[in-house]
Amino acid sequence: MKTFAEIAAEIAPQITEMMPWDAEEYLDEHPDTLIVDIRETHEYDTMHIADSLNVPRGILENACEWDFEETEPELVQARKRPVLLACRSGNRTTLAAYTLQLMGYENVMSLKTGLRGWSDYELPLVDIEEKPVDIDDADRYFANKILPEQRKPASP
């Protein structure tokens, strides 16, 4: 059996990952890039990259195809466009980028370190009303909040 982290590490060499500072420059040079935030809607609503499209990971594959209730036409039509995937820490986007490649997306990238890294680099985020998010608020939001009961038990 493999853990999620092991699976992500195994497929990472097969995808393109981009650090936030490189993504900032890339987006300036490629304004046609579709930014897809694959976090859950409540995460996206709290803060996200301006002009990004929210397609939660759980419906991503359906959103990439016609004839589903989850279909996102802009995403379906983006197979030849640059697509930058974002999540909280870059793990979900590793799997998502791999899947999109299998589905025929020609230029899909994963934001390495995710929005946590984006925020650490002090790149702009906006809220649900597209208003700028204060960097300190973003730092607090992206701080690790793993509860004790969520941690792996110590080995006996």
Q: Which residue stretches match the model-derived regions?
A:
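Active-site flanking residues adjacent to catalytic metal/cofactor-binding acidic residues
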Residues: V36
